[in-house]
Amino acid sequence: MSDLYRFGISLDRELIEAFDRHIKGQGYQSRSEALRDLIRNELLRKTTAEGGLVAGAIVMTYDHHKRELVNRLIDIQHDFHDLIISTQHVHLDHENCLEVIAVKGNAPDIEKLSSALKVLVGVKHLDLSLSSAD
């Protein structure tokens, strides 16, 4: 016997047609797959809002020629060492670097780390992506 649970929902025709167009454009094979992802995303938002355990990545680009920027980035990462699983550093060109920081911990702490990095002069772009850690 499967652990799957089947249920029915009632939706307006316009809403389900719009949903079907959306999920087709996203490449979903079925409504069930799309609904599972929507439910997971909503549960992740709840976990994040409640300060729960999450994992994710901070992806940033920066100008490594900016005075003291690299030292500040390293100092901040050391301040949050308990959240950082690993980092990957990529030289994009002579001036620009890409850094990917894998993180795991309580959502508010990871958001503090992300914010501390984002506001540094020389950081051109930073994006935080979180997922469930359980």
From Swiss-Prot:
InterPro entries: Acetolactate_synth/TF_NikR_C, ACT-like_dom_sf, Arc_rbn_hlx_hlx, CopG, CopG/NikR_regulator, Ni_resp_reg_NikR, Ribbon_hlx_hlx, TF_NikR_Ni-bd_C
SUPFAM superfamilies: ACT-like, Ribbon-helix-helix
Gene Ontology molecular function, alphabetical: DNA binding; DNA-binding transcription factor activity; nickel cation binding
Pfam name, any one: NikR_C
Keyword DNA-binding: yes
Cofactor note: Binds 1 nickel ion per subunit.
UniProt keyword list: DNA-binding, Metal-binding, Nickel, Transcription, Transcription regulation
Residues annotated as binding Ni(2+): H78, H89, H91, C97
Cofactors demanded by this protein: Ni(2+)
UniProt key word S-adenosyl-L-methionine: no
Membership in a protein family: Belongs to the transcriptional regulatory CopG/NikR family.
PANTHER family reported in the protein's UniProt record: NICKEL-RESPONSIVE REGULATOR (PTHR34719:SF2)
Role according to the record: Transcriptional regulator.
Protein name: Putative nickel-responsive regulator
Taxonomic source organism: Chlorobaculum parvum (strain DSM 263 / NCIMB 8327) (Chlorobium vibrioforme subsp. thiosulfatophilum)
